[in-house]
Each structure stands twice: as C-alpha cells, then as structure tokens.
A protein has these predicted regions:
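Acidic, mature catalytic/reactive cores of soluble proteins
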Residues: 1-172
Length: 173
C-alpha cells in the first residue's frame, strides 16, 4: 500500500509524483504491507519512522561487539541479518532477492526468499556470538516446528523451507 500527501500518477508499473517544495513544506511517502494502518499524514509518518529507528538502535545496543576497528562493520552486518528474520516464525531468509542466476546469463536461478537451513545456521551463529541470541532461539523454534518436534511427529529436515514453514519441493529451487 502506497500512502502519501502528494498527488500520485500511475504509469504502467510505476507510481510517480512531482512537486516543488518551499521552506516549511512537509510531505511524506509511505510504502507498507503491514496489517497495521499506514500513516495518514506527515506527523504520523515521522513518528513511525522515529520509533522504527529507535527500535533498531535499541536492538543493536543489546549486542556485545568487540572494541575493534571493524566494530561498525560488524554492527552493520548484524543489522542486515536481523532484517532478514521473519519475526512471526523465526525463519531467516537467505537474501531479500529472487531469481538471481548462478552465472550471468545462466539457466540456474535460485530464489533466496526461502530459509535455507545450513545458511541460516551459520548466519545466526554469528548473531549468537555477538550476544544477539534471541534470533537464534527463535530459529531453533522454527526448526522444531518444521521438523514436527513440537507435535511428536518427527520429519527429516529439508534443505529449505518457506518463511512460514512451508515445505518447498525441488521444482521451486
């Protein structure tokens, strides 16, 4: 859902807006897909943006980052991994992209919007070693759910799952 106080024009698959701002003008554009209501004005948009930013700052401050010249890079990497976590289930997406070829112009395309068990484990181990263990705990719950451990029916783990725990056949890879 696209919400704004600008006049939007739709051109094919694109939404465009033009305006000339003068000092004191306030505009906002919000793109959302949440069940929560989108902001309806500049003040609501600014408040939501501030709260989101503050939430991310609080999360990164939980971590135990070494006093190292690369500390900022470790923090940025941790934030990137956190952004790939699907919080309703604890699944970690391999990436936020889809259909990237294994080689340029190649036929083998991989969809990285799934949770690949091996890759997720390595990534979450990184967060765990930085003291950000909640995400690892949530992922273990995700694994327990998809393996049937929570209802007593154990299933062998697949290579990957949908972020909601959906079983993915090889045709989707």
């Amino acid at each position: 859902r696209l919400t704004t106080n600008l006049r939007i024009g739709l051109e094919g698959h694109e939404a465009r807006a033009r305006t000339r701002l003068t000092e004191g003008d306030k505009v906002f554009v919000a793109l959302s897909w949440s069940k929560h209501p989108a902001p309806q004005n500049f003040e609501e948009a600014a408040d939501k943006m501030w709260k989101t930013s503050e939430s991310w700052r609080q999360w990164i401050n939980i971590g135990d980052f070494p006093d190292h010249p690369w500390r900022a890079y470790l923090q940025r990497s941790a934030l990137t991994l956190k952004g790939l976590v699907y919080s309703p289930t604890g699944a970690l997406l391999a990436a936020s992209s889809t259909s990237l070829p294994e080689t340029p112009q190649g036929e083998r395309n991989w969809d990285y919007r799934y949770s690949w068990i091996r890759d997720s484990t390595f990534a979450l181990w990184g967060l765990y070693t930085l003291g950000l263990d909640r995400e690892a705990d949530d992922f273990f719950s995700f694994i327990a759910d998809v393996s049937g451990a929570t209802n007593g029916e154990r299933h062998p783990l697949q290579v990957m799952y949908g972020v909601g725990g959906e079983q993915i056949g090889r045709a989707h890879v």
